[in-house]
Amino acid sequence: MNENLFTSFTTPVILGLPLVTLIVLFPSLLFPTSNRLVNNRFVTLQQWMLQLVSKQMMSIHNSKGQTWTLMLMSLILFIGSTNLLGLLPHSFTPTTQLSMNLGMAIPLWAGAVITGFRNKTKASLAHFLPQGTPTPLIPMLVIIETISLFIQPMALAVRLTANITAGHLLIHLIGGATLALMSISTTTALITFTILILLTILEFAVAMIQAYVFTLLVSLYLHDNT
Amino acid sequence: MASVVPLKEKKLLEVKLGELPSWILMRDFTPSGIAGAFQRGYYRYYNKYVNVKKGSIAGLSMVLAAYVFLNYCRSYKELKHERLRKYH
């Protein structure tokens, strides 16, 4: 156990130079580009997966919304790969840093909302009032809808940070508990180890799901606004 | 000692041990030279292990293993306090 449980979440710096830049850029190495029609297995698999995801996610948008395909696909690839790489031992996950998630969430949300306000002003303003509300409630409801609009980027960022950080912390804690229990009672250690296995499976799922959820929500905000 | 092939164009495995320092100093250390070295290295690995007809999981796993190893080296300073030793 670390003297401070959170030392694994500090930004990696080597001799004062930010190593975190290299770590953030590393997943791009794992997605090679190719201009050929028939590629090697690695590239074919990735292209197939990307086609599957893009069809599923961008089919709900009109032609204006589909101009965002590149952005949303890069987003889901980045978050998914960064989260999955963070499950390797000793690695650093950039998505545990709230600063980075805010940096992803706020511009994307703001872009979607501002597009909506510029192009369909009436419809965007109409979102602030659900249909069929009784007249006395209108002022309060507008305030509530405004707050819920402005909380969207915060929720996006904090959701991703909290999920990934919590998962990593749980793995650290339960792993440490298994190790400590080994000398005390082997059966309990085995039970804890099984819990660790299940947790790791969960974390793999969470890594991918969080990427999906983030991108899906941005896409939803986009759909509302195009 | 005049070699048949000039020192600059020899590959590393053909350089004699005494000529090694001068060979290293003759390499291109400009930014574009270093970028070229990284690019050459990347494509060498890619074309040998990934860009083949029947690529296997080994191509990806070796990269991930190297990544894990580098991260271990990076965090060794904190990790060495967690070894099972009587005196740290």
Swiss-Prot record, chain B:
GO terms for cellular component: mitochondrial inner membrane; mitochondrion; proton-transporting ATP synthase complex. Pfam families: WRW. The modification N6-acetyllysine is found at residue 16. It is found in: Mitochondrion; Mitochondrion inner membrane. Coiled coil: none annotated. It comes from the Eukaryota. GO terms for biological process: proton motive force-driven mitochondrial ATP synthesis; proton transmembrane transport. This is ATP synthase F(0) complex subunit f, mitochondrial. It comes from Bos taurus.
